[in-house]
């Protein structure tokens, strides 16, 4: 089987380009918005989008084709403290379309991860309403980029709080999920966390609702609900993606020494070799986000450690898993 089936990616910020003031999370404070007007917010979004384009071009030139877009790219969208917060992204549609076209033509996978305020299991109706708005905003950006679940694009969300009763909260989560518009439901992907919802809490929900499950290996490792990643369990996880004809997505990091449990490491020096066996074992491709502070530096470090670089006739770089790793068995 072709071993060019594992891709590595990173989230939100390019640490190299950040040194040149290229980043996508500019957010003017409310006082500035009120004094300079809402056009200033739109100018900020344009700057964020242009820098997103630069990051994707950087990724392409370095053979990185998996990236999570920052949720901070559209500041104050839906912020109830601002009178004009109901703006939409249509003012930037041409730039967004250009970015998406470039990314799709070059085979990039783009995803997003709405923040902790998305709580579909909340017992507060206003929190749920705002969660719907937040999810719609994220879905709209992906759609304007030309991406959908058919491109394996997803909106990663956590189970959220337990509100004193995990079982009841999960039932509320499922009920509210079913109320979401179809376009959003198609993008939702559940991820385990290290505190409230482990793999066995969320995987059955995913299987019931036909939602892909994003395995966060690090969260499981440091969780009080930690479980062994057996072949049987991995098959269940992979199947939540395969039945949707989507490429499985996982997250990996390490614990940063001296910080709170669950704090992502600054860098990564090695990957678990069992990950390299997944494509052959389950006949699937696999994309892995490295959730680390040095971002693309760890991605490239791991690519050069475990993969061979291949340059096509058109000058595009691709990373092929080294035979030393691709041939290893269980």
Swiss-Prot record:
Respond yes or no to whether keyword Electron transport is given for this record: no
The GO biological-process annotations, alphabetized, read as: nucleotide-excision repair; response to UV
The region annotated as signal peptide is none
* EC number(s) on file: 3.-.-.-
Pfam assignment, any one: UvdE
Q: Which UniProt keywords apply?
A: DNA damage, DNA excision, DNA repair, Endonuclease, Hydrolase, Nuclease, Virion
Q: Give the enzyme class.
A: hydrolase
Q: Which domain of life is it from?
A: Viruses
Which terms in the GO cellular component ontology are assigned?
Answer: virion component
- Name any one GO molecular function: endonuclease activity
InterPro entries named in the record: UvdE, Xyl_isomerase-like_sf
Q: Does the keyword Nuclease apply?
A: yes
The record's subcellular locations are:
Virion
Family under the similarity heading: Belongs to the uve1/UvsE family.
The entry's function note states:
Endonuclease for the repair of UV-irradiated DNA.
- UniProt-recorded name of the protein: Putative UV-damage endonuclease
Species of origin: Acanthamoeba polyphaga mimivirus (APMV)
Q: What is the lineage of its organism?
A: Viruses, Varidnaviria, Bamfordvirae, Nucleocytoviricota, Megaviricetes
């Amino acid at each position: 089987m072709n071993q060019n089936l594992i891709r590595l990616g990173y989230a939100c910020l390019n640490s190299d380009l950040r040194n040149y003031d290229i980043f996508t999370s500019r957010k003017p404070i409310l006082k500035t918005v009120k004094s300079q007007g809402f056009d200033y917010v739109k100018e900020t979004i344009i700057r964020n989008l242009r820098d997103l384009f630069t990051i994707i071009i950087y990724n392409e030139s370095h053979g990185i084709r998996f990236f999570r877009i920052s949720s901070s790219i559209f500041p104050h969208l839906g912020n109830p403290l601002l009178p004009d917060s109901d703006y939409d992204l249509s003012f930037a549609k041409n730039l967004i379309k250009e970015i998406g076209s470039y990314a799709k033509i070059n085979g990039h996978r783009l995803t997003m991860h709405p923040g902790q305020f998305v709580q579909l299991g909340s017992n507060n109706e206003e929190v749920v309403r705002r969660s719907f708005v937040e999810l719609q905003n994220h879905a709209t950006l992906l759609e304007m980029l030309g991406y959908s679940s058919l491109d394996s694009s997803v909106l990663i969300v956590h189970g959220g709080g337990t509100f004193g009763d995990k079982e009841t909260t999960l039932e509320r989560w499922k009920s509210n999920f079913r109320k979401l518009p179809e376009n959003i439901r198609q993008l939702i992907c559940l991820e385990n966390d290290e505190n409230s919802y482990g793999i066995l809490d969320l995987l059955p929900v995913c299987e019931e609702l036909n939602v892909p499950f994003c395995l966060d290996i690090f969260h499981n490792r440091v969780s009080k609900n930690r479980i062994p990643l057996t072949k049987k369990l991995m098959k269940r996880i992979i199947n939540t993606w395969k039945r949707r004809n989507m490429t499985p997505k996982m997250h990996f990091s390490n614990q940063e020494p001296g910080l709170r449990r669950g704090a992502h490491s600054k860098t990564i020096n090695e990957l678990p070799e069992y990950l390299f066996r997944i494509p052959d074992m389950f006949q699937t491709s696999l994309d892995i986000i490295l959730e680390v502070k040095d971002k693309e530096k760890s991605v490239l470090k791991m690519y050069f450690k475990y993969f061979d670089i291949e340059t096509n006739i058109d000058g595009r770089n691709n990373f092929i898993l080294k035979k030393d790793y691709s041939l290893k068995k269980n």
